[in-house]
């Protein structure tokens, strides 16, 4: 755990000006997608997301977090997502068109990366040894929000990668004492339902076994089970923090 937090501190101390620039670029591009969703803006967002995932792979994991175990594997994970966005730039699968989903939840996910440092400060942490907006889980939350707000067609590879990363984030809640990462895990439950509900609705006319109504019911059940699991994890973390506070 000491290595984990030391690498975060070194990363934040060395890259905080770049992180501010990245957050500003993300905000500008997101606003442009709402106000002026031209093809150039959409391509710029895909390039930005490819670069952002590459930043996490190279700068975060390989340069500043190389001391951690399996950092090369995690760098490969984010590198693959960067390649997927670059391929999407060529294939134009993700159109970044406004969806019929409520944008309130997407807006909440946009703001969650900014909440990461606030949660760290509330826990008594201080800069640079704290979570920041340009870290793996906060980037994943922002990407999920973007896809919920703008993507009609689901890029299933990105969805699977991001959901898998949410499970990794949940593990970090236990092993590294980062309750902030529960934000990503918790946001995945409604996001999963919204993603796959639309997929089921689009294929409602197809004859499948089970049928669309049964699939929707199974999806709701799955999300409830995952939500209960995440809730149990959060309660366990709160109990551990309470025991630590009492012992002090």
Summary of predicted features, one role per range:
Residues 40-50, 99-106, 151-162:
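Membrane-interfacial loop-to-transmembrane alpha-helix junctions, especially the N-terminal start
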Residues 51-59, 109-120, 162-174, 227-233:
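Aromatic-anchored segments of alpha-helical transmembrane domains
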Residues 20-30, 77-91, 138-150, 183-199:
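Hydrophobic cores of alpha-helical transmembrane segments in multi-pass inner/ER membrane proteins
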Residues 244-248:
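Conserved small/polar residues in nucleotide/adenosyl-binding loops
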Residues 70-75, 175-189:
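Loop-to-transmembrane alpha-helix initiation sites
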Residues 68-145:
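Membrane-proximal helix-loop-helix units in multi-pass membrane proteins
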Residues 211-234:
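Internal/C-terminal transmembrane anchor helices
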Residues 1-25:
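Hydrophobic transmembrane alpha-helical segments in integral membrane proteins
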């Amino acid at each position: 755990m000491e290595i984990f937090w030391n690498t975060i501190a070194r990363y934040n101390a060395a890259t905080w000006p770049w992180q501010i620039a990245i957050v500003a670029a993300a905000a500008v591009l997101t606003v442009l997608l709402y106000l002026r969703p031209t093809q150039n803006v959409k391509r710029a967002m895909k390039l930005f997301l490819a670069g952002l995932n590459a930043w996490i792979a190279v700068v975060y994991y390989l340069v500043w977090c190389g001391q951690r175990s399996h950092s090369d594997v995690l760098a490969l994970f984010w590198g693959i997502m960067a390649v997927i966005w670059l391929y999407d730039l060529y294939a134009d699968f993700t159109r970044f068109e406004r969806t019929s989903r409520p944008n309130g939840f997407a807006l909440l996910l946009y703001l969650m990366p900014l909440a990461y440092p606030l949660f760290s400060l509330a826990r008594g942490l201080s800069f640079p040894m704290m979570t920041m907006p340009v870290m793996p889980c906060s980037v994943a939350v922002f990407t999920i929000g973007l896809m919920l707000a703008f993507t009609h067609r689901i890029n299933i590879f990105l969805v699977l990668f991001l959901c898998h990363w949410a499970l990794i984030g949940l593990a970090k809640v236990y092993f590294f004492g980062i309750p902030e990462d529960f934000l990503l895990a918790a946001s995945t439950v409604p996001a999963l339902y919204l993603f796959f509900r639309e997929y089921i609705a689009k294929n409602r006319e197809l004859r499948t076994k089970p049928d669309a109504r049964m699939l929707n019911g199974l999806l709701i059940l799955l999300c409830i089970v995952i939500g209960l699991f995440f809730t149990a994890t959060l309660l366990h973390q709160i109990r551990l923090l309470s025991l630590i506070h009492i012992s002090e």
